[in-house]
Amino acid sequence: MKMLSIEEELKNNSYPGRGIVIGKTQDGTKAVTAYFIMGRSENSRNRVFVEEGEGIRTQAFDPAKLEDPSLIIYAPVRVLGNKTIVTNGDQTDTIYEGMDKQMTFEQSLRSREFEPDGPNYTPRISGVMHIENGTYNYAMSILKSNNGNPESCCRYTFAYENPVAGEGHFIHTYMCDGNPLPSFEGEPKLIGIPNDMDEFTETLWHSLNEDNKVSLFVRYILSLIHI
């Protein structure tokens, strides 16, 4: 798979929607994740990320302008022991609760589908990072409608064992702007991951469309043994 520039991917797409990046730094010592949200409506744009425990949740920037909280207020990031869960919806809780009961990432998501926001039927994208005794692996998932048909749910899981230093994967909800919004297609995109968190954060934030970007979260976890 050809490695893509995350900067170019974002600059050339005015509305990828919500996106998850997971990977490993070039020096092989840190696990990396990033999550961003975008919005076109006032309700979607009226959000910020706030810390909650070891993770984050979305919160209305102006509570007076909050219209429908059902699909926009949730915890995108939660930590369960040596696992970090990152998603674009309340399936974060579904995965957390399932894995806490010894279910797998994939099994935990069996009870969920795409979001009920027809005609877009926004995909649910999710990721989990597992770090233990200096080893690291991660998985990503997308649950989406079958070409806009809400009667059929397509489920895809991508697992990455012993990921390569300096590489990561990027998945987002929409291929591009549109009406209805077209769901993401294909495998998560292979991208480069730098060593410096501030550099990566700046690259992501400044590459996102100025009119549509809302919030960005980036985390580097220093717990990998580089051999």
Regions found by a protein language model. Give the residues of each.
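Short hydrophobic alpha-helical segments used for membrane anchoring or interfacial signaling
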Residues: 20-27, 126-132, 218-221
